[in-house]
Structures are given as structure tokens and as C-alpha cells.
Amino acid sequence: MVKDAVVARFCELCQIQNIKLNELATRSGVTPSTVYSMVDATRRDVSIVTIKKLCDGLGITLGEFFSTADFDTLEQEIK
């Protein structure tokens, strides 16, 4: 699932940069509740605008964010 891959990637990047989700929110100019709702499995998908803001907070591009094997191997999600 795409959302799971997005959440896993942000968690990985936070671990690499040694920051917590609260710090990611602060750096990105989004509320902590936005970040925590993203990792909540019962919540809706995260928007590309939010992903862009979080990437900016991490100092990476969208291309760098999505350039992983996890995203390359995702199955189509046509409903």
C-alpha cells in the first residue's frame, strides 16, 4: 500500500537524521497532529502537498524521497 510505504520512508528518514516526528513537524511548518495522523493506520492517505512540506523539512527533494526500491515495487492500487 502506498501510504504504508510513505510512512515507512518518513520514519526511516527521521531515524537517519535522528529526529522525532514532532521535530519533523516543526521543521516542516505543519502541525504535529498532521504528522501523527499520517502514521495512524485508520486515517486517510497523506496528500502530496504534505509530503512536499515534510520533504522540505528534511532537506530532501520529492525525487529523493520516492527514489527507493519500496516505491518501485508497489503494486497498482486500482479500485
Show which residues each predicted segment covers.
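Short, basic-rich loop-to-helix N-cap that marks the start of a DNA-contacting helix
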Residues: 42-56
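Alpha-helical residues within the helix-turn-helix
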Residues: 15, 26, 56
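Recognition helix of helix-turn-helix/homeodomain-like DNA-binding domains
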Residues: 29-45
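A short, Lys/Arg-rich alpha-helix, primarily the initiator
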Residues: 1-23
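Residues in the recognition helix of alpha-helical DNA-binding motifs
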Residues: 13, 27, 38, 68
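Short, charged recognition helix plus adjacent turn
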Residues: 37, 66-79
